[in-house]
Regions:
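Noncatalytic carbohydrate-binding groove/subsite architecture in carbohydrate-active enzymes
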Residues: 1-76
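Aromatic-rich peripheral "rim/lid" segments of glycoside hydrolase catalytic domains that contact
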Residues: 33, 37-40, 56-99, 103-111, ...
Length: 173
């Protein structure tokens, strides 16, 4: 109803941006249905404004140099992994990425226009991520600190390119 109300007020926009995380938002089939429904209903281009898929559930605590009590942990909590149709492996991330790109590319009437990966380069080094001690102090947030997205980057914990980034590079509609 939000977009319907927005349009009825005479407002204009060019794109509709969606967030999609398979551990929070369901299957790629559900995403595809939503993208096509929105594209047909509003005749607007679709961008996935944030997406990611993990490549591991291995700990990266040693890279962050934070005590357990200081760490945020993973955005993909272990109990959420069971909801994902792809394994949290390097191959699973690449397979998800290929299937995801095909779904976006095949939105009805060529309305699938692109995506932004969240967060492709947040590898687990001390001070990386949004929840650094400095940012938490600025926001007056007690914490904890840490980078909860490192296992969903497009680089491994040592900064090496993962196959999912190559899938993105090589993708052709």
């Amino acid at each position: 109803r939000w977009f319907t109300n927005f349009i009825e007020r005479g407002e204009e926009f060019e794109y509709i941006g969606l967030s999609y995380y398979p551990f929070w938002h369901g299957s790629l089939d559900q995403l595809e249905f939503n993208m096509n429904d929105i594209a047909k209903r509003f005749n607007k281009d679709i961008i996935i404004a944030e997406v990611s898929m993990g490549f591991t559930m291995d700990s990266y605590q040693e890279y962050e140099k934070l005590a357990d009590s200081e760490r945020k942990g993973y955005a993909t909590k272990p109990e959420l992994v069971e909801k994902i149709d792809y394994p949290m492996t390097i191959e699973g991330q690449a397979d998800f990425t290929k299937d995801f790109l095909n779904r976006v590319a095949n939105v009805v009437d060529d309305h699938g226009k692109g995506f932004f990966w969240w967060e492709p380069a947040w590898i687990p080094v001390h001070g990386s991520g949004w929840a650094t001690p400095a940012s938490l102090k600025y926001m007056n947030d007690p914490g904890p600190c840490g980078n909860e997205w490192a296992n969903q980057a497009l680089f491994d914990y040592d900064g090496n390119v993962l196959p999912a980034l190559e899938v993105i590079r090589d993708f052709r509609k």
